Amino acid sequence: MNKLVEDCMRLGFGMMRLPRIEGTNDIDLEHTKRMVDAFIEAGGKYFDTAFIYEGSEEATKATLCDRYPRESYYLADKLNASDFAAKNEKEAKNEINISLERTRAGYLDFYLLHGIDEGNHDKFDSYGIWDYMKQLKSEGVIRHYGFSFHSTPEHLEQLLTDHPDVEFVQLQINYADWEDTLICSRRCYEIATRHGKPVIVMEPVKGGKLANPPQAVKDILQRANPDASFASWAVRYAASLPWKQM
């Protein structure tokens, strides 16, 4: 595998489900600052946000970009071409400008076509987003581009065949979904590796569900190591994959 970064630990920080101020929907920035600081102090560098994560890019600016030297972290952001995010090509291609304004990051280390599935694939094609990604990279606005994926293994095979210049793929991978017949984590992972693409993992703890798995699963994990948290088992599983970048 051609690693995208060499000086980064295998755990990233998702700026999606951030703590909220009690009784409101406002992100608790002070709490988030402490989380960001703890992550960086532990050796973390990779942060992930998205255009459609409400308040996330602004929180990334306040808790990360305004407080740390730009070269000290990697930032991933995402372009969403679905109808609720962009009504036309112009709006889709302008998302990068809004994201850079919100984060004040200057540039993006990783830029993803967000959540490709069979329902929005045609928008990325008709808006010329694939070539737009190459343009942004040539201009130095982004360093690497890829896509996050929520569809079938056959669809992933088609995308990677049609777009061999894509540098990485972000997949939902965890031990609960590895053999799931809808998410098909294993099959998608194997397709990505066969195409030589580094894999960035999302949902390693399945939105927190694997931090509190069914009792039968708890019993197995506690017998194996009573001192390990359930969440740590989930993270270790995802981190053990050899083609996993993050």
Provide a role label for each language-model segment.
Residues 1-73, 132, 138:
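N-terminal binding-site loop/beta-alpha segment at the start of enzyme catalytic domains
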Residues 5-11, 43-46, 69-73, 105-109, ...:
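Short, well-ordered coil/turn segments that N-cap beta-strands
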Residues 13, 39, 47, 60, ...:
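Conserved, mostly hydrophobic/aromatic
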Residues 14, 50-53, 111-114, 148, ...:
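Conserved residues at the C-terminal ends of beta-strands
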Residues 16-30, 78-91, 119-122, 216-228:
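Active-site mouth loops of central-metabolism enzymes
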Residues 56-66, 88-100, 104, 121-131, ...:
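Distinct, well-ordered alpha-helical segments
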Residues 71-84, 111-116:
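A short, structured active-site edge motif that brings together acidic residues
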Residues 116-246:
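Beta/alpha (TIM)-barrel catalytic core signal, keyed to glycine-rich beta->alpha loops juxtaposed to Asp/Glu
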